[in-house]
Amino acid sequence: DTPKKNRGWKHMNGHYHRSKKGGGEWEFFDLPKQWQIHYKDLTFNLKPFNFKHTGLFPEQATNWDWFSDKIKHADREIRVLNLFAYTGGATLAAAAAGAKVTHVDASKGMVTWAKENAVSSGLKDAPIRWLVDDCVKFVEREIRRGNHYDAIIMDPPSYGRGPKGEIWKIEDSIHSFIKLCTKILSDDPLFFLVNSYTTGLAPAVLTYMLSTELAPWNGTVESQEIGLPVTESGLILPCGASGRWEAK
């Protein structure tokens, strides 16, 4: 284990204990039921869940900064589709940058949480469409409707179920889903972002899939590991990978 020399470890507010059977539970010392954290102009409401999450993946801030800059300098309205959108970090970042956003997640509770984050961030009246839906079925319906988006963000879980029990396994489904999503890209797409927290989807794999499926748009692809810097050691705590396609 990494030596825990920082004095903050002696005053931690909570400790998540993993179970050998899967899952785990929190041990609370001095932790409120809910608290807020700020990133630039965004405010997020956090609370602990039995599956370890607190409602935010802070390592995604590097992606928020990247696509926010692209949206701000696009000189046109950008329609963004955020799939598996969780508590709305990417949704709020895109909306704050001036985009018109469609936020889709299969969990009603997560969409409600994302709306609360929007209110806390001063984005209550931003052009965000909130949808509780199975992401694959939503995209299939958008294809039939003829709707298109200038940018797509997806943060798929390793494993999940839709509102009606639809099963999602990322290794089996992600490539075909990326291909499906290209059918709702506009004629002048700005970017396409895929996040992965599964070890089997390394940056090279994300690069291959994005390069293959978005070849007709003649953009550039960059994939990389993302993580959180550890102040004490100077090391980076690995937190998954991101694949970015962007227009030239």
Language-model region placement:
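Conserved class I S-adenosyl-L-methionine
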Residues: 75-86
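C-terminal catalytic and target-recognition region of SAM-dependent MTase-like enzymes
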Residues: 189-248
